[in-house]
Amino acid sequence: MPKILVLYYSTYGHIETMAEAIAEGARSAGAEVDVKRVPETVPLDIAEKNHFKLDQKAPVATVAELEDYDAIIVGTGTRFGRMSSQMAAFLDGAGGLWARGALNGKVGAAFASTATQHGGQETTLFSIITNLLHFGMTIVGLPYAYQGQMGVDEVKGGAPYGATTIADGDGSRQPSATDLDGARFQGRHVAEITAKLVG
């Protein structure tokens, strides 16, 4: 059974919710799944003042443990059309793994959230995917086999590059049922592809 890490950074809980849905999907395909978050880099007083969600139950990941997994699914909210600085700092810290080729051949995937429909979902996914490709990972997206990302009948996330959600400028919109279904689909899809690759 493949061993999968869902690695995320979430300021207000939207990506935390998506991470749990991705993990649920991966487990439904028989994978062993851990959900972990990257360290917060914002000082506590500022995080509290800005109402960051500080009660997240997922343990904090370490760079060293990344090589223990067959697949890593990375998620973060967008910052100016790219991944958050917290996630970028964590991945930047994996230079030693890159130098040893420790992640070569592992499966990688991305998911994201933005405040608006045009707030950089796909560029944020690409910023994650670019890092994973530099690590030598094989990328798995959210294929159009997931029909929920089609149509314009409602505000919805999702792209062939990964599951997404839209939080609204004030963070009031939580991931919809469609967004969460997409996350579960991607988690299951990553688990199935990983199982084929690792035997």
Curated annotation (Swiss-Prot):
GO terms for molecular function: flavin adenine dinucleotide binding; FMN binding; NAD binding; NADH:ubiquinone reductase (non-electrogenic) activity; NADP binding; NADPH dehydrogenase (quinone) activity. It is an enzyme of class 1 (oxidoreductase). Substrate binds at residue 98. FMN binds at residues 10-15, 78-80, 113-119, 134. Binds 1 FMN per monomer. Keywords: Flavoprotein, FMN, NAD, NADP, Nucleotide-binding, Oxidoreductase. GO terms for cellular component: membrane. PROSITE patterns: FLAVODOXIN_LIKE. NAD(+) binds at residue 12. It catalyses: a quinone + NADH + H(+) = a quinol + NAD(+); a quinone + NADPH + H(+) = a quinol + NADP(+). Its cofactor is FMN. It comes from the Bacteria. Residues 4-190 form the Flavodoxin-like domain. Its EC number is 1.6.5.2. Belongs to the WrbA family. This is NAD(P)H dehydrogenase (quinone).
